[in-house]
Regions:
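Short glycine-rich substrate-engagement loop in P-loop NTPases that contacts/grips substrate
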Residues: 45-73
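Catalytic P-loop NTPase motifs of RecA-like helicase/translocase cores
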Residues: 54-56, 81-83, 111-112
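Interdomain hinge/linker elements that couple catalytic modules in large macromolecular machines
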Residues: 135, 139-316
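Conserved P-loop NTPase "ATPase switch" module shared by AAA+ and STAND
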Residues: 69-85
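Conserved catalytic/switch belt of AAA+ P-loop NTPases
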Residues: 86-104, 108-110, 117-119
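A cross-kingdom feature that marks ATP-driven nucleic-acid transaction machinery
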Residues: 1-27, 33-46, 50, 70, ...
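Short regulatory helix/loop adjacent to the ATP-binding pocket of P-loop NTPases
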Residues: 110-126, 138-143
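A short beta-strand-to-loop transition that corresponds to the Sensor-1 phosphate-sensing loop
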Residues: 105-109, 115, 123, 130-132, ...
Length: 408
């Protein structure tokens, strides 16, 4: 099994020089612990996991003793199982713990962020990690957040590998989970089947004691069928046979464990006719393709959700470019009551950058016409792009590019 280097590695090293405590959060099995273990080789840092029942029991019942038995520098894995540790780590940090003393990982992002902000506010750096990016799998892993400045786009090409339409859907179908993509688990279907079972049996069961596991599995599949769509909780609830309130709670669980994420609609005081409903995406398109039972990339490319899952892949990859730089990402979509719609809007450096995503190798220039609606707002519109299956970069004008999705 080959280790796949992660873009976040240097960020982790840099942050650990400044902060005594680092909290690395992200979905289950995206490689958080593997990356940190790689970085700590030969450093003398020890690792302790709260997956171990005895370690968990001690951390919960006597957190002070636990930290004495596992002195810094230490990696504490799955820290969400012992929230009692946070206030004791705070004491150690306040007493002068050295930079890089505590590396913490966990897969329940919302709970962990809340704990860190309550107990370790200003004392810990919080970093998000997702599945492997295009840059990590098919490039050199060094790309910055997506920028639509021409010089940066030209430089970006040097770090990534181009692909045709079929190869793009192979990327989408295979997903970005390190366990599968590193070669450790070669059978994709077996890997994702095991992933879902572990996720429900451990994470979901912890968050919803007594949950009907088979029904929840059906619920995840129903959600996967709706990637790239405006969220309709009632429709998902009806498909599965649960109440709307139950569906809302279960969607919260999927979001808190980062299986799904949302794009919120962009709005400001001058754009008052915009909709309020978010769009839903899966963090990993391989998981979504598995749940929707597409047995190979070719069938997926010609299937009913081909455009939606391509959009999901594109949005998730853009999001990763920001997460992998440890920078805040202000990503939205636009839709108003006059049916004007823009698939994605990036808010960066005081400008709005509109993006349209299309399953086409030769998209029409009229697709960029909706971008002008943003001119009615108070934030200036910057460069935009049509993201598509074209293999080479092109442009409509100096402010609107036609960009291959492989360049993200």
């Amino acid at each position: 099994m080959a280790y796949i280097h992660r873009t976040l590695e240097q960020k982790i090293i840099d942050i650990s020089r400044d902060y005594s405590c680092l909290l690395l959060i992200g979905p289950r099995q995206v490689g958080k612990t593997t990356m940190l273990e790689h970085l700590m080789e030969g450093s003398g840092r020890q690792k302790v996991t709260l997956d171990d029942v005895e370690n968990r029991r001690l951390a919960q019942s006597d957190p002070a003793l636990f930290l004495e038995m596992h002195p810094a520098p230490v990696l504490i894995d799955e820290v969400q199982y012992a929230p009692q540790l946070f206030s004791y780590i705070k004491i150690n940090v306040d007493n002068g713990a050295a930079p890089g003393s505590y590396w913490l990982t966990g897969s329940q992002a919302f709970q962990l962020m809340e704990l860190a902000q309550e107990s370790l506010a200003g004392r810990t750096a919080i970093v998000h990690m997702s599945a492997l990016s295009q840059s990590e799998l098919y490039g050199d892993g060094t790309t910055e957040p997506l920028s639509l400045k021409l010089e940066k786009l030209n430089r970006r090409k040097e770090h990534l590998s181009s692909c045709n339409s079929m190869e793009m859907f192979e990327r989408i179908w295979n997903g970005g989970m390190p366990g599968h993509r590193s070669g450790r688990y070669t059978d994709r279907d077996v890997f994702y089947s095991s992933y879902i079972q572990t996720y429900i049996n451990r994470d979901v069961s912890d968050m919803i004691p007594g949950v009907d596991k088979l029904l929840f599995a059906d619920f995840i599949r129903a959600a996967a069928c709706r990637v790239g769509q405006m969220l309709n909780t009632h429709d998902i609830a009806q498909d599965v046979g649960v109440s709307d309130d139950t569906a809302k709670r279960w969607l919260q669980v999927l979001e808190k464990s980062e299986v799904i994420f949302y794009l919120r609609p962009y709005s400001n005081n001058l754009l008052k006719r915009t909709v309020k409903t978010p769009k839903m995406y899966f963090f990993d398109t391989g998981l979504a393709a598995y749940l929707t039972k597409y047995s190979n990339p070719e069938i997926l490319m010609n299937g009913a959700i081909n455009g939606a899952i391509l959009e999901n892949y594109t949005v998730a990859e853009i999001r990763k470019t920001w997460l992998n730089s440890a920078k805040e990402c202000l990503l939205h979509y636009y839709r108003d009551k006059d049916t004007n719609e823009i698939d994605m809007v990036i808010e960066a450096d005081g400008e709005l950058h509109p993006l349209e995503i299309k399953k086409s190798t030769n998209p029409g220039t009229e697709l960029a016409s909706a971008f002008k609606v943003l001119d009615k707002g108070s934030v200036p519109r910057g460069a935009g792009a049509i993201l598509c299956l074209r293999e080479e970069i092109s442009a409509i004008d100096r402010n609107t590019f036609i960009l291959p999705i492989w360049m993200i």
